[in-house]
Amino acid sequence: MATIEVEQVTPVAAENIEVPPPKAVESEEVTTVSESLPAPVTESQAPVEVTTKDLVVEETEKPIEETEEAQVETPEVVEIKKDEEAPVETPVVVEDESKTEEVVEAKKEEEVEEKKTEEAPVVVEEEKKPEAEEEKPAVEASVTAPVEKADE
């Protein structure tokens, strides 16, 4: 086995540890951070088109009306589709599942029948083998018996 040498380290007293003073944030760093943030847009800086109340109201009202009409029509169409499609799809899925189960069951039945047919000849062969073995000792016994008589 390999041996490991462990070196013990004694902790240094807390008085000897030098802690650097906290870093003072320079004004340059503060300005770069504030410049990287997006500045809020004031009314004096905003484009003229946005500040005009008439144009903004007309533009916002038209899209709202169009979206409201579209929203009203869309749910009705979706609801009708859901009602029509859901009952139609569900029986189809159930039928598919039952068909696959029937097919699987039919295959299992075929496999069982095949196993039965495979097992039957094996059993018959096993029965034949003992008969053949029984015949051989009888023949050997008849052969050995005359030999013994000849020796006497």
From Swiss-Prot:
Subcellular location(s) of the protein: Cytoplasm, Cytosol
Induction per the UniProt record: Levels follow a circadian cycle with higher levels during the night and lower levels in light phases. Accumulates in darkness within 24 hours, but repressed by light and the product of photosynthesis (e.g. sucrose) (at protein level). Induced by sucrose depletion, but activated by mannitol and sorbitol. Triggered by gibberellic acid (GA) and salt stresses (e.g. NaCl and KCl). Suppressed by a high concentration of calcium Ca(2+) and of other metal ions.
Main location: cytoplasm
GO cellular component: cytosol; nucleus
Region: 7 X 5 AA approximate repeats of V-E-E-K-K, residue numbers: 57-136
Sequence repeat extents: 57-62, 67-71, 78-82, 104-108, 112-116, 124-129, 131-136
Keyword terms: Abscisic acid signaling pathway, Calcium, Cytoplasm, Repeat
Composition bias type Basic and acidic residues, residue spans: 96-138
The protein's name in its UniProt record: Cytosolic calcium-binding protein 1
UniProt source species: Arabidopsis thaliana
